[in-house]
Amino acid sequence: GGHCVARLDDDPAGRVVFVRHALPGEVVRAVLTEKSAKIWRADAVEVLSASPDRVRSVWREAGPGGVGGGELGHVALSAQRTWKRWVLADCLRRIGGEEVAAAVAALPEAAGTGAVPVEAMPSEAAAEAGDDPRARRLAGTGTRTRIALTITDDGLAGMHGFRSGTVLPVTSLPLAVST
């Protein structure tokens, strides 16, 4: 999740590249992070034409070249829900077939749209309504109950880089539940 599909402008083969930290419709400058015979991956490092759904990432350490786990941190909450709804519906259709997709579309919550219902968490709803200043700051964060930390060579708390065995130090984890 959290990748956009791009095509290289100057590639006669029309090669497909999966780009993290981009949004549908954006034009970005990206750095290739992985090349194989079947798939290329990249990180968007500069946004040349931004989506209206782009926001400042809630977790800079999960940005380009950083740790994994924050691939939608730069996406507005309402757009995250739309994205997740589409991914879930697509998976149900591909794996479960059209019969499952039709059953989901018939759910009262889908309201005839065929979309899978994805609702805001209470903190998100309060933030969107402007009811709670703290929730506004924390909306979309503080929900992850499990994290996998490791130790860097310097003895600092860290996490693995995206698709990497390299341990990167982390000083914040805004997605984690605070106690």
Write out the residue ranges for each language-model feature.
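Accessory RNA-recognition modules of RNA-modification enzymes
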Residues: 1-179
